[in-house]
Amino acid sequence: MSSVFLFISNESGKAIFLISGDVLVKSFCSLSDTCPFQDSCRSCSLLNAAKNYLAGTAPDSRIKTLDGELSAGIGEYKIGKNVLLKVMGLGSCIGVILSDVSTGICGIAHVLLPGASDRGETKYAETAIEKMVEDMVKMGARRSRITAKFAGGAQVFKHMSLDILKIGDRNAISVEETLIKKNIPILAKDVGGEVGRNVIFNPADGSMIVKYTAKGEVLWL
């Protein structure tokens, strides 16, 4: 049984669904805590529209199909085209998203440390961003049209005040300084705090979805 990722945006909200056959496998929804249907997704107009689209009973130009998903582990980055990109379990780490909307080519990095690496290690902010840009351009992205979004950098050791332990702040500063130095426009960011995050990039509309691991809050940026 084949599975498909669908992005839909209508007057109710926005959502990404992974549907296998007629079964909802997982979803990322802008309604989040305000969802009027709570756990009863069967009543959701977004999901019903997506299923009708798959069944061929209700063509909808507002629905877009995504070509799968890629997830970057700690110190890794992933590049793709028209794919959902994810970094999960961010504490002090930063999820950095680069995209060229004109080609649909995008990348995501799971940055662990600030600065650059002489050995090309992509766990460092500057090195990861440089390599992502290079690979995206090789894939067909236009350097002048690449933009950025990023999130993370929580202070996970909140009981410690030494500056050297504030790695989340240092990561966020390093990412921002690198992007500015490379003239890459920053369209959105969500950094700091004391709560971990999961970060997802939706190439269908260029949104960064930030899910707070403890609070359950979801942001679409």
From Swiss-Prot:
Domain of life of the source: Archaea
Keywords associated with the record: Chemotaxis, Hydrolase
EC number: 3.5.1.44
Pfam families: CheD
Catalytic activity: L-glutaminyl-[protein] + H2O = L-glutamyl-[protein] + NH4(+)
Uppermost EC category: hydrolase
Coiled-coil annotated residue ranges, if any: none
Gene3D superfamilies, A to Z: 3.30.1330.200
GO MF annotation list: protein-glutamine glutaminase activity
An individual GO BP term: chemotaxis
Keyword Hydrolase included in the entry's annotation: yes
The family this protein is said to belong to: Belongs to the CheD family.
Function: Probably deamidates glutamine residues to glutamate on methyl-accepting chemotaxis receptors (MCPs), playing an important role in chemotaxis.
Protein name, UniProt field: Probable chemoreceptor glutamine deamidase CheD 1
Organism name: Methanosarcina mazei (strain ATCC BAA-159 / DSM 3647 / Goe1 / Go1 / JCM 11833 / OCM 88)
